């Protein structure tokens, strides 16, 4: 049924996008500047600075960064492995910041420096179409500069830049092998389609029929990526890739709105609109994010969320982001100017923090989140996920979780590993099959995650772990995840229940029915805390002057364990100050085991979970 509904949704989205692409009224094409900006926006951004300390902070950050570019040499075509992406991203940041600085200050030094940057990029032999993200971002960079500086640029420079956008940007998408993003369901679709639409809208007058056809193709392709937000707004590639993919999706739709007065149906996709809430709940009390999959843990204001707040007329969507700016967490990312653009239309004095303490996402990467509050670094945060390892950018982490309490993240996720480092070492990184070398990377495989392992075996990469129940009462909050498909071949049933009591003590309960062979089961978490086994069933963690106890309960043979440091390969990032702690269970063939591990700052605390009808949990 779920597969049928997603297929039906895809048909609807494709039909909608196709209809919109055929009815775009190019007679309404706005004059330059037409990308993102409408009449009055520049004045509104200046007024935003006058009434908002946060806006003034962001504006000053952009201007000071642009000042630094004035004396810098233009970027060069320097590859990093198989990518030019770092150069494309730097170019986008420079041109966007310099163009913003010119429009808001009228200082021609910024426009002249942006012109110099663009002309240097036009001299590149190509923008590396074999890795099309590089082309997508570079095309957007020059499109913004061409459009925002249109009245400043000499005709000769416009011609050079417009020709480069057409030849090295738009026409690169004609190569079907290189432009596979048209068929992609992930961030590549969003980033590359956005870049192509920017290039086409900016230079529409130069090749109108070509540009219209390319925009139509992009709008027919983009709904494939829109499916990823179903059904609740979560992003299957994690926090970092939401910021990337959705940031460019916002850029795409906002450009259509400003240039043509339409959103092409994108802004009516409800799960897409809900996705800003997902990012809010990925923010933890420590000021970090829940960094599952290929994501870092760093956290700052997310500029693209301000488009959602504007679109939904709900400033509270960015309440957490406004708080982050006050904490000094202003992002240095290349899309920062859209904070000023979208934020200027909001009354940010009317924001309020979220009221709900829990949030759940079903779909490709199911997640349950609990947060005890929103105003203190000592608030409790817990998040647990399902999913499968064969998803894009996924790790082998079904059943894994993070846990913050007393201002400490006790159970951590190591997040992403540098791609270039692995690729240069010859690692087959993007192969997600069962026997892929990808799973041997410590940060990506199961050994580093806060989940189970049976007999040291890999998880079943195609086994989808679903959230099958959630509960949210003052005395009991949590979720139940069916991990049976994850451990197919080693167990006939694995159900993980995560529950927090009224004092935010966490219990992870695992119901295991062993397969037809004996199993050694490792229950493990990764932590930065000091660890000590203080009793046969108890491990004490200490960090930043705080203490947490892990206490095991169950009628099975088990021992507490602190694992030795991992033996990293030469090309892996070494995770210093990391410990893996937990319990090792010995199960007989076909044995049923119910075990609990309680994580509490009270040594004697132990929770017994209510009896659950586990037979109802199978999918």
What role is predicted for each listed range?
Residues 42-43, 53, 377, 408-410, ...:
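Primarily extracytoplasmic ectodomains and periplasmic/lumenal surface modules that are beta-strand-rich
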Residues 21-22, 322-329, 422-619:
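CBM-like, beta-strand-rich accessory domains located in the C-terminal region of large
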Residues 54-57, 63-66, 71-77, 356-358, ...:
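Beta-sandwich/jelly-roll carbohydrate-recognition scaffolds of carbohydrate-active enzymes
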Residues 27, 33, 372-435, 441-446:
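Terminal accessory carbohydrate-recognition/targeting modules of carbohydrate-active enzymes
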Residues 26, 33-50, 54-288, 295-296:
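Aromatic-lined, polymer-binding surfaces characteristic
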Residues 1-23:
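Bacterial Sec-dependent N-terminal signal peptides
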Residues 134, 188, 241, 392-398, ...:
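Histidine-centered active-site/metal-ligand motif
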């Amino acid at each position: 049924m779920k597969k049928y509904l997603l297929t039906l949704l895809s048909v609807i989205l494709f039909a909608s996008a196709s209809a919109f692409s055929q009815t775009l009224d190019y007679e309404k094409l706005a004059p330059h500047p037409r990308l993102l900006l409408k009449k009055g926006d520049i004045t509104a951004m200046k007024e935003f600075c006058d009434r908002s300390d946060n806006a003034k902070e962001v504006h000053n950050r952009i201007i000071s960064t642009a000042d630094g570019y004035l004396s810098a040499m233009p970027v060069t075509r320097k590859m990093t492995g198989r990518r030019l992406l770092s150069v494309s991203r730097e170019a986008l940041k420079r041109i966007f910041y310099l163009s913003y600085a010119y429009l808001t200050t009228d200082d021609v030094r910024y426009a002249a420096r942006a012109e110099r940057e663009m002309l240097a990029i036009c001299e590149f032999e190509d923008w590396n179409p074999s890795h099309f993200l590089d082309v997508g971002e570079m095309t957007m960079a020059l499109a913004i500069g061409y459009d925002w500086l249109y009245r400043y640029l000499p005709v000769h420079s416009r011609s050079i830049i417009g020709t480069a956008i057409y030849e090295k940007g738009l026409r690169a998408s004609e190569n079907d092998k290189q432009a596979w993003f048209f068929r992609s369901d992930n961030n590549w679709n969003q980033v590359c389609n956005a870049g192509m639409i920017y290039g086409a809208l900016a230079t529409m007058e130069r090749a109108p029929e070509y540009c219209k056809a390319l925009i139509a193709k992009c709008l027919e392709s983009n709904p494939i990526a829109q499916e990823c937000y179903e059904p609740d707004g979560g992003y299957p590639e994690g926090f970092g890739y939401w910021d990337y993919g959705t940031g460019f999706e916002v850029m795409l739709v906002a450009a259509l709105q400003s240039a043509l007065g339409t959103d092409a149906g994108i802004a009516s996709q409800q799960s897409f609109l809900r996705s800003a809430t997902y990012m809010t709940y990925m923010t933890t009390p420590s000021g970090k994010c829940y960094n599952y999959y290929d994501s870092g843990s760093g956290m700052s204001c997310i500029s693209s969320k301000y488009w959602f707040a504007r679109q939904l007329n709900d400033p509270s969507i960015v309440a957490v982001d406004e708080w982050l700016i006050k904490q000094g967490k202003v992002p240095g990312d290349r899309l920062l100017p859209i904070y000023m653009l979208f934020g200027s239309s909001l009354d940010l004095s009317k924001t309020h923090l979220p009221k709900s303490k829990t949030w759940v996402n079903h779909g490709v990467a199911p997640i349950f989140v609990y947060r005890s509050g929103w105003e203190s670094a000592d608030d409790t945060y817990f998040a647990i996920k399902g999913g499968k390892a064969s998803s894009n950018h996924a790790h082998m982490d079904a059943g894994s979780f993070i846990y913050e309490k007393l201002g400490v993240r006790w159970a951590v996720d190591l997040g992403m590993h540098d791609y270039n480092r692995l690729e240069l070492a010859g690692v087959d990184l993007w192969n997600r099959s069962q026997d892929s070398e990808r799973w041997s990377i410590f940060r990506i495989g199961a050994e580093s995650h806060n989940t189970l392992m049976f007999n040291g075996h890999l998880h079943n990469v195609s086994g989808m772990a679903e959230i099958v129940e959630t509960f949210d009462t003052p005395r009991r909050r949590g979720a139940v995840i069916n991990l049976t498909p994850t451990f197919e071949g080693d167990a006939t049933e694995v159900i993980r229940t995560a529950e927090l009591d009224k004092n935010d003590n966490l219990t992870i309960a695992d119901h295991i029915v062993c397969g037809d062979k004996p199993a050694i089961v490792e229950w493990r978490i990764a932590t930065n805390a000091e660890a000590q086994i203080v009793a046969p069933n108890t491990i004490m963690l200490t960090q930043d002057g705080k203490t947490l106890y892990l206490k095991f309960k169950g009628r099975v043979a088990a021992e507490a364990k602190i694992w030795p440091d991992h033996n990293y390969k030469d090309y892996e990032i070494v995770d210093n100050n990391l410990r893996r702690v937990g319990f090792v269970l010995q199960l007989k063939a076909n044995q049923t085991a119910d075990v609990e591990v309680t994580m509490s700052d009270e040594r004697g605390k132990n929770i017994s979970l209510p009896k659950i009808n586990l037979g109802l949990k199978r999918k």
